[in-house]
Amino acid sequence: MDSLHSTMNQHVKGKHLSFEERVIIQLRLKDGYSLRAIARELNCSPSTISYEVKRGTVKLYHGKVKKYKATQGHDAYKAHRKNCGRKSDFLRKAQFMRYVHKHFFKDGWSLDVCSNRATAVGEF
């Protein structure tokens, strides 16, 4: 297929692979294309294709046959995406919140005093 006459949207470098691109990888591997040829067609790095093939390869027939499945690769991608992104600071700051709660409600300190005292003492 000539990329000049393709009706499919071209892959933008730096973006994640779509499910349609994973299906193309599956079909091209079935047809015997090399990883570099697939990368050229999708306009992405050969290492991207290599990582995707490793991520989406399943073992069939008691591990004797390995085959790339687009659905398996996409499911692995979604599972990995759940772990990315900024982590919540709430768990790390729970101790400080207990400190403020104790001194604000029980000792009658203001929020400014709680914050400044904790900073001055270097507790947090």
From Swiss-Prot:
Transmembrane segments: none
Domain of life: Bacteria
A GO molecular-function descriptor: transposase activity
Name of a matching Pfam family: HTH_38
Single biological process term from Gene Ontology: transposition
GO CC annotations on file: cytosol
Keywords: Plasmid
InterPro entries found in the cross-reference section: Homeodomain-like_sf, IS30-like_HTH, Transposase-Integrase
Protein name according to UniProt: Uncharacterized 14.4 kDa protein in laf 3'region
Organism of origin: Lactobacillus acidophilus
